[in-house]
Amino acid sequence: MSASDFEERVVTIPLRDARAEPNHKRADKAMILIREHLAKHFSVDEDAVRLDPSINEAAWARGRANTPSKIRVRAARFEEEGEAIVEAETAE
């Protein structure tokens, strides 16, 4: 794998749009927003984004209705079997 095939960044993802959803759907919407944001900024399909369980735990930490307003994520884009893949985990 060459250096051009691998890219890693720490990204702050705003989740305030999840507040537009009803209380019982906010954490679900936050997970959708995270996947959409990473797909857009790393130029891959949403299906090619793999999220670590730590991101799910951070989005759901305060319950379904009280999602965080933003989340910091460390994401890496690389080539696997000719396709671009993004793997993400929470940044500490």
From Swiss-Prot:
Any one GO BP annotation for this protein: cytoplasmic translation
GO MF: rRNA binding; structural constituent of ribosome
GO CC term, one of those recorded: cytosolic large ribosomal subunit
Keywords, sorted A to Z: Acetylation, Ribonucleoprotein, Ribosomal protein, RNA-binding, rRNA-binding
Record-linked SMART domains: Ribosomal_L31e
UniProt entry tagged with the keyword Transit peptide: no
Matching Pfam families: Ribosomal_L31e
List of residues that carry N-acetylserine: S2
Amino-acid biosynthesis listed as a keyword: no
Function text: Binds to the 23S rRNA. Located at the polypeptide exit tunnel on the outside of the subunit.
NCBIfam families xrefs: PRK01192.1-1
Subunit structure: Part of the 50S ribosomal subunit.
Family per record: Belongs to the eukaryotic ribosomal protein eL31 family.
Annotated protein name in UniProt: Large ribosomal subunit protein eL31
Species this protein is from: Haloarcula marismortui (strain ATCC 43049 / DSM 3752 / JCM 8966 / VKM B-1809) (Halobacterium marismortui)
